[in-house]
A protein has these predicted regions:
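Acidic, metal-coordinating catalytic segment for phosphate/diphosphate chemistry
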Residues: 144-147, 152-191
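N-terminal strand-loop-strand
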Residues: 171-214, 241
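Secondary-structure boundary elements
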Residues: 159-165, 195-197, 239-241
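Functional cleft and adjacent loop/helix regions within the main domain
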Residues: 83, 116, 209-212, 217
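Short Pro/Gly-enriched beta-strand edge/turn motifs at strand-loop
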Residues: 69-73, 136, 172-176
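Short, charged surface segments at domain edges that flank catalytic/cofactor-binding sites
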Residues: 129-147
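N-terminal alpha-helical interaction blocks
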Residues: 1-131
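The catalytic Nudix box helix
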Residues: 214-242
């Protein structure tokens, strides 16, 4: 069994469903030749399907039980590996490898035919903490990496095509005169709750469902402190100075 690299007390803290799932990302083995092929050949490896930034869930129609992630094994859904635009190793959890597969090129009818046995695709943000903690984290992880792959198919330095490397955690430029490597990165951002006593400042987008509101948020600009970003974003989104 793969030992988690994190202390047990971290997994017992109040959960962040989209960030910490205790998965061992095994970065030290990603460079080994043929390693990913061996991972996807294991019958018990679990697949984390992603389709156009949506994740696969089972039991969405059950109003009694909470939804659960649909994570079929290679034995059950190995054909998805042949259809995937990208195959990315996520890590090991309790001795089981988890691999994300991007099915975005498939149209809605085809993806429904290929995955309908296990569930249906839905927006993870709409389900959030209703699902089990590890499932939420691994689904967000898979969705984030596939989002990055979809937007870095070409080199930002010379414009040549890039190819996936190191289990899907790097993309390399195919131009021998360039050879740039690109990595997934998280942009710094602020999410803030502005309040005045028992009142809170919330915002919404026109496309959101009626009655849906959110705290304000935004990206941190170069050379800007977190506090400055909060003040700027609040003014930009609401016209209120803090």
């Amino acid at each position: 069994m793969t030992q988690s690299p994190f202390p047990d007390d971290l997994t017992r803290r109040p959960p962040n469903y989209f960030a910490f799932g205790g998965i061992d990302r095994s970065a030290h083995v990603r460079e080994q030749e043929g390693w990913l092929d061996a991972v996807v050949a294991r019958p018990d490896t679990r697949l984390v399907p992603v389709w156009r930034s949506r994740n696969l869930f089972a039991d969405l129609g059950n109003r009694v039980m909470p939804p659960v992630a649909a994570l079929p094994t290679v034995v059950e859904a190995g054909r998805l590996l042949d259809l995937a635009q990208e195959v990315v190793f996520l890590g090991d959890f309790q001795g089981i490898a988890h691999v994300a597969v991007d099915l975005s090129p498939l149209d809605e009818e085809m993806v429904g035919t290929m995955t309908g046995t296990w569930g249906q695709f839905s927006d993870l943000r709409e389900i959030g903490p209703l699902i089990e903690r590890f499932e939420g984290a691994v689904m967000a992880y898979a969705r984030g990496l596939m989002f990055w792959h979809a937007r870095h198919g070409f080199c930002g330095v010379c414009g040549s095509p890039t190819v996936s490397a190191k289990g899907g955690h790097q993309r390399n430029c195919t131009n021998p005169d360039c050879g740039a490597s690109h990595f997934p990165r998280t942009d710094p951002a602020v999410i803030m709750l502005v309040h005045d006593g028992d009142r809170a400042l919330l915002g919404r987008q026109k496309i959101w469902p009626q009655g849906m509101y959110s705290t304000l948020a935004g990206f941190v600009e170069p050379g800007e402190s977190l506090e400055e970003a909060v003040a700027r974003e609040v003014f930009e989104e609401s016209g209120i100075h803090i």
